[in-house]
Design a protein with these regions (language model features):
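Catalytic strand-loop-helix junctions within cyclic-nucleotide turnover domains
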Residues: 84-94, 128-148, 165-169
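Acidic/histidine metal-binding catalytic segments
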Residues: 77-78, 118-129, 171-178
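A generic structural signal for short hydrophobic patches within well-formed alpha-helices
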Residues: 10, 39, 82, 178-179
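Regulatory cytosolic signal-relay segments
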Residues: 1-27
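Cytosolic regulatory/linker segments at or just downstream of nucleotide-handling modules
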Residues: 135-137, 158, 164-214
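Catalytic NTP-binding/metal-coordinating core of nucleotidyl cyclase/transferase enzymes
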Residues: 19-100, 148
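A structural signal for short, well-ordered beta-strand segments
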Residues: 31, 81, 126-132, 205
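Alpha-helical scaffold within the catalytic cores of cyclic-nucleotide enzymes
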Residues: 55-71, 87-128, 153-166
């Protein structure tokens, strides 16, 4: 369980406080997608074992930040991570925790690039997308393989926001729902009302600049 959830959530599950939360339900959650840009180029310039070790160590640091902000790692996506805040147990701070996590990843990346190994020739760049809303979360599968899965519009939107960061020239994009729930806790800039693939209507998109207060 500690591979997926933060220690406080695991403790609740083991004490049977949140065990039913894993069986499946509709709930509010904040989703964050994280992706390492140009990872294919990095991989092509390194021996496979070296690249695997680099990515594993780098992801360990990122996942520690997710867990440290009461998030959960839902999926490893090759060169990316899907994490959730509020699954399986929603709290009043899920949106704020996701924003804190993204900003801490930004700061960690700046430090990493200053001391990165010689074999990483160019600074590592990443993109992050955050969206908030109703999702389905629960165990799906069979006796052979079971997986805790999170599905819903916020998952798709967070993924698309992450993919839009490069074009927007920023590292973190959030949807309007996330932005409005954070209120005056953050400094952000509206990118624009923009069409997103799979969405019939344009949505508000913001870049996340900094945390003002908590």
């Amino acid at each position: 369980l500690t591979k997926y959830f933060s220690e406080d959530i695991v403790e609740g599950i083991l004490q049977d406080e949140h065990a039913n939360s894993l069986s499946g339900r509709h709930q509010e959650a904040t989703i964050m997608f994280f992706d390492v840009r140009k990872s294919t180029t990095i991989a092509e310039n390194l021996e496979p074992q070296v690249f695997a070790e680099f990515l594993s160590e780098f992801f360990t640091d990122i996942m520690d930040l997710v867990y440290g902000n009461h998030g959960s790692v839902n999926k490893l996506l090759g060169d990316g991570i899907m994490s959730t805040f509020g699954c399986p147990v929603p709290t009043a701070n899920d949106v704020l925790n996701a924003a804190k996590c993204a900003l801490q990843i930004r700061n960690h990346l700046a430090t990493f690039n200053d001391v990165r190994p010689d074999y990483i020739k160019e600074p590592i760049r990443v993109g992050m997308g955050i969206a908030t809303g109703k999702v389905f979360a629960g165990n799906i599968g069979s006796v052979r393989r079971m997986e805790y899965t999170v599905l819903g519009d916020p998952v798709n939107l967070a993924s698309r926001l992450e993919s839009m960061t490069k074009e927007a020239g920023v590292d973190i994009l959030i949807d309007g729902n996330t932005r409005h729930r954070l209120g005056n806790l953050i400094k952000c800039r509206k990118v624009q009302h923009q069409g997103v693939r799979g969405k019939l209507q344009e949505i508000e998109i913001f870049s996340l600049d900094e945390l003002l207060k908590t």
